[in-house]
Amino acid sequence: MGCCPGDCFTCCTQEQNCCEECCCQPGCCGCCGSCCGCGGSGCGGSGCGGSCCGSSCCGSGCGGCGGCGGCGGGCCGSSCCGSSCCGSGCCGPVCCQPTPICDTK
């Protein structure tokens, strides 16, 4: 993705296909659906650490990531998993429980 020229201190719309450097500004959090950690509502404020899971923030104090219970993606700890999540680690495309191993067949 590329930044929107001239938009680095304004809110980008999702249709503008901006990168985090454009959107991750105070008051503009979440405008592109992938902004975390810039202190705005739903973006990583209120002591929220971690990384992005789609349009949500993963990590301590954050919700909306699907958790780590079972398969299907979401957060593993403070990290975002792609296709599956096993225990405390990420793996894919198939999650084999209860141990965090992957069967890619």
From Swiss-Prot:
GO CC, alphabetical: cytosol; intermediate filament
Highest taxon listed in the record's lineage: Eukaryota
The entry's keywords: Keratin, Repeat
Function, in words: In the hair cortex, hair keratin intermediate filaments are embedded in an interfilamentous matrix, consisting of hair keratin-associated proteins (KRTAP), which are essential for the formation of a rigid and resistant hair shaft through their extensive disulfide bond cross-linking with abundant cysteine residues of hair keratins. The matrix proteins include the high-sulfur and high-glycine-tyrosine keratins.
Record's subunit section: Interacts with hair keratins.
Identification of the protein by name: Keratin-associated protein 17-1
Species, as recorded: Homo sapiens (Human)
